[in-house]
């Protein structure tokens, strides 16, 4: 049975194309300061001093922390573990998972907002970006400007700085499996093994790509934690949210105006809460899985 043909004079039906993936809009978060931002940077320093510093510590005549895969021995300060001791690793992972669930139930997404490597390295890379290209408005202006000497210089400097940090991160990662002093000596003499070259470059590329380009996309689409974290919330969980009863109806007004007499809430609709968000969401739309609870 044939479909009915459109009557003469009627407009032809339009085809609507639906994209399978959302087109990413580049986010330029505004720099923030304050108590929570200070805590976030304190944890950036603490985690990175731990990560970059541990391979340099010695315990007797060996590194304090070394996972010697070829010897099948794992040194953690005075503790020496063998493959048959991996049952202890299972216990550590179980305790870590339960701790994550506990802290999430009590205080929301503390891990995501303050200690997750994706958050930490994104903060570090955005700091480098701000130092070279300027704050939010300057970066947006640079994005929209045509390619010229200034743009090439700033973009090139940013990527060089990112690559230096990423490469050192990759070297540090491999130094947990090969003594760092021996590793640096063989890098200087171009005498690295194939697997060492692979893991240095792989970890460097992952750091550069995730923290420099993908950023909030990792939190939105790749990390499974965001999808089920709401199941760990209850009525007593501390969360970062918008107080609609206080803020609505939103609207601009002069500083001296009384919002109640104008029929307005406390929100002046300035949009700064959106500009400072590292995942680019509008917190006024309610609890969203994209929110990492950073309290920016």
Where are these regions (language model features)?
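Structured cytosolic domains appended to multi-pass membrane proteins
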Residues: 267-268, 274-296
